[in-house]
């Protein structure tokens, strides 16, 4: 598993050069990493995450909410994606409900 991480996102080709020949499937935390070196992802939407962050900022700045008492918020939706080429190379059939990542 590779979570959402800028270093990993910048090095997906190097990761793929190691994991694909060794037949190691990588599940990624977001679509970009999955497209580069993964087989599947429950991908967050950075737009939705940013929108939620904006709502929380408004609660703090406009409404005076105490950040220390606010609950942790999560990305409201995830999308199920898979990398068709990597799945084929590793002999993996993606589960129903997953959408192929466009090239």
Name every feature range the model reports, one short phrase each.
Residues 9-10, 37:
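Pocket-flanking alpha-helical
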Residues 1-5, 39-46:
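Second-shell loop/turn segments in exported
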Residues 26-40:
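Flexible loop/hinge segments that line or gate small-molecule binding clefts
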Residues 44-65:
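Hydrophobic alpha-helical segments within soluble ligand-binding/sensing domains
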Residues 11-18:
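A short acidic, amphipathic alpha-helical/loop segment
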Residues 59-103:
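Hinge/cleft segment of the Venus flytrap/periplasmic-binding protein
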Residues 1-8, 26-29:
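Periplasmic-binding protein-like
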């Amino acid at each position: 598993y590779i979570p959402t991480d800028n270093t990993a996102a910048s090095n997906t080709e190097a990761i793929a050069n190691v994991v694909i020949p060794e037949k190691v499937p990588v599940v990624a935390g977001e679509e970009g990493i999955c497209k580069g070196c993964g087989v599947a992802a429950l991908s967050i939407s950075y737009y939705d995450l940013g929108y939620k962050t904006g709502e929380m900022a408004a609660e703090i700045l406009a409404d005076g909410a105490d950040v220390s008492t606010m609950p942790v918020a999560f990305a409201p939706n995830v999308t199920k994606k898979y990398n068709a080429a990597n799945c084929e190379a590793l002999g993996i059939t993606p589960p129903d409900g997953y959408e192929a990542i466009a090239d």
